[in-house]
């Protein structure tokens, strides 16, 4: 959470990567047997995505944004998410919904801040989602790119009251950023 706060900037969303943990390690975490994870533990996959190296994060961030976003490690400003109407709920099953949201954010002027090597999260093991709709999801994603879409039709506004959709932004809150934040 601290890394997300350090990377938070108005007009930007933050995306990071994740380590993946096995079914056995997930059971131990959920039972409380293990309360802290490290990249080199047995049962951690994608360990290169679970390493926290602040200097590398700074260097990687300067290389520019990536389209490979992971919804399990993203953060947005509320008003930016409302502007693009949140996740497109017409996506079915697994695949491309996170990337499609990132495209709409980018198209609407909200820039990505890559947080690789910071903001480490671990993805708990779960059953595989059906991927029968992957080709339809890919087409929806490509259509958003082609048409330079900034909003989806079926999204967040279905769940918000009218005042939530049109309210003025909250007063600006300044988040103190330590001098050592690496920006």
Language-model features, listed with the residues they occupy:
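Conserved donor NDP-sugar-binding/catalytic core segment of glycosyltransferases
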Residues: 1-39
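Conserved hydrophobic/aromatic beta-strand scaffold that supports enzyme active sites
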Residues: 13, 73-75, 121
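Terminal low-complexity segments of carbohydrate-biosynthetic enzymes
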Residues: 72, 107-111, 133-183
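Short aromatic-enriched loop/helix-cap "lid" or pocket-rim segments at secondary-structure transitions
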Residues: 25-29, 126-127, 133-136
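A short, conserved alpha-helix in the catalytic core of glycosyltransferases
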Residues: 73-85, 91-111, 116-117
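Residues that scaffold the ATP/ADP-binding catalytic core of kinase and kinase-like folds
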Residues: 3, 84, 124
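Active-site donor/metal-binding and catalytic loop motifs
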Residues: 115-132
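A recurrent flexible, glycine/aromatic-enriched loop bordering the glycosyltransferase active site
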Residues: 41-75
């Amino acid at each position: 959470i601290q890394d997300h706060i350090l990377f938070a900037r108005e007009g930007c969303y933050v995306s990071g990567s994740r380590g993946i943990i096995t079914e056995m390690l997930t059971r131990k975490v959920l039972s409380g047997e293990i309360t802290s994870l490290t990249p080199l533990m047995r049962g951690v996959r994608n360990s290169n995505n679970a390493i926290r190296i602040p200097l590398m994060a700074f260097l990687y961030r300067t290389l520019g944004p990536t389209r490979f976003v992971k919804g399990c490690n993203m953060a947005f400003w509320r008003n930016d998410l409302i502007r693009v109407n949140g996740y497109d709920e017409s996506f079915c099953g697994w695949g491309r919904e996170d990337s499609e949201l990132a495209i709409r954010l980018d198209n609407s002027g909200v820039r990505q801040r890559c947080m690789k090597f910071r903001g480490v999260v671990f993805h708990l093991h779960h059953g595989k989602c059906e991927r029968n709709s992957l080709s339809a999801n890919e087409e929806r994603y490509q259509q958003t790119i082609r048409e330079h879409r900034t909003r989806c039709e079926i999204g967040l506004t279905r769940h918000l009251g009218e005042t939530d959709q049109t309210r003025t932004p909250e007063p600006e809150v300044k988040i103190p950023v330590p001098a050592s934040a690496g920006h």
